[in-house]
Amino acid sequence: MKERKVIIKTGLNLENSYTSLPEIFFTRQSPSRVPSPKLAVLNYPLITSLGLNAQVLQSADGVDILAGNKIPEEAIPIAQAYAGHQFAHFTMLGDGRALLLGEHITPLGDRFDIQLKGSGKTPYSRGGDGKAALGPMLREYIISEAMNALGIPTTRSLAVVTTGELIMREAELPGAILTRVAASHIRVGTFEYVSRWGTVEELRALADYTLQRHFKKGYDKENPYLFLLQEVIKKQAELIAKWQLVGFVHGVMNTDNMTISGETIDYGPCAFMDVYNPKTVFSSIDIYGRYAYGNQPNIAAWNLARLAETLLPLLNINPNEAIKIAENAVSDFTKLYKNNWLSGMRAKLGIFNEEFQDEYLIEDLLSIMHKYGADYTNTFRALTFDNIEDTVLFDKMEFDKWYKLWQERLTRQEESKLSSKQLMKSSNPSVIPRNHRVEEALEAAVKEGDYSVMEKLLEALSKPYAYSKEQDYYSKLPEPSTCPYQTYCGT
């Protein structure tokens, strides 16, 4: 690997603090060389916020770094080890096709993982080729950047490069590598891994590292490991509520896909709900609906219980006391989630103050939307802009009754109607990454090499709350189909 290390002024300022952990947590590994890397898409706003050099990253040397052909001098590429409950079944996992180059320290002192996804085989590949296809990598780029624009914590996408390879999936597909940026890649599954195969000392090392990286205030607490658990629970309660508020269905909420930082990660089989239905499932492999839209809060609580189990040896020397502490912490999730969700739903309806009956008002609207097959995003958009006549709810008796109750509710607060409208506009996106529009962009890019469709989509998605007539195209529902939209774990 030494001959591949280069000094190129990309602006990357890499450290490798994760390698200070015991070696059970990672394996050093070089990226596979690729024959003909070309830049497909580069995230200029993210480059600016990270303090990187766009001009250099676009150069041949920069593209070689994004492809893994050249390695920044300070980088120590590693594949991270982790386990996970996949559809409730525990299994050993790890980075099977991704490598962490290191942690970039921004000019402001923030720390972000820089990971190459699709960079070749690792010891954790489990028979896979370690490669990634262009379509799924572009899909992750689109969805993750849309999530960021919506104000939802997420990993980010810095770049996608094509590799010049054809990789075998359901057919021969063009290969690609995505550069992912994350607060960290520490997962619930990372803790499960060391809990199952490591020592208590190694578990403590991971917990201490996580406190240092994400929850430094924990060192001042009487029980820092309880603080760690509580903070992760709070972050996940906030995150899942934000998913629900925009109709996002993750699709594969395995414990290895729940981050300790509270960021959304892994955009494989995800999609956004069109017609409101709590049972909405997109993933082709989720045949029993375990990860359906309406079940996501319950799954999050289940995953957090698995995290709590791993921390038992650190929570209290007495096993029974440790279990009580963990159970009390996890039991807080439901209330925390509900408070976040109710607060967000009030905002979507222009409500500033709290009343006990608000939950019934919200649930009644959702029930009516479900009954009549109303589009989730467009219904709230119609309420925001007073054009409900454009929805399927227009002239429905139940909705008329609900609408009057809502208008009456708005009078029981000090804020003006104008203030309510402004709150609704900032809480109800006009545009989301509709599944058919995403597929349209991917087909043009992958099959025709035309990235203009994707660029226009990304431009619309970058300002989801700023309504304009140009966004109407991206707000239209898909044509009725006998085949429901399905997603696959390509990313």
Swiss-Prot record:
One of its GO terms (molecular function) is AMPylase activity. Coiled coil: none annotated. This is Protein nucleotidyltransferase YdiU. Mg(2+) binds at N257, D266. It catalyses: L-seryl-[protein] + ATP = 3-O-(5'-adenylyl)-L-seryl-[protein] + diphosphate; L-threonyl-[protein] + ATP = 3-O-(5'-adenylyl)-L-threonyl-[protein] + diphosphate; L-tyrosyl-[protein] + ATP = O-(5'-adenylyl)-L-tyrosyl-[protein] + diphosphate; L-histidyl-[protein] + UTP = N(tele)-(5'-uridylyl)-L-histidyl-[protein] + diphosphate. It comes from the Bacteria. Its cofactor is Mg(2+); Mn(2+). It is an enzyme of class 2 (transferase). Nucleotidyltransferase involved in the post-translational modification of proteins. It can catalyze the addition of adenosine monophosphate (AMP) or uridine monophosphate (UMP) to a protein, resulting in modifications known as AMPylation and UMPylation. InterPro entries: SelO. ATP binds at G94, G96, R97, K117, D129, G130, R180, R187, D266. The active site is at D256 (proton acceptor). Its EC number is 2.7.7.-, 2.7.7.108. Belongs to the SELO family. Keywords: ATP-binding, Magnesium, Manganese, Metal-binding, Nucleotide-binding, Nucleotidyltransferase, Transferase. HAMAP family: YdiU_SelO (MF_00692).
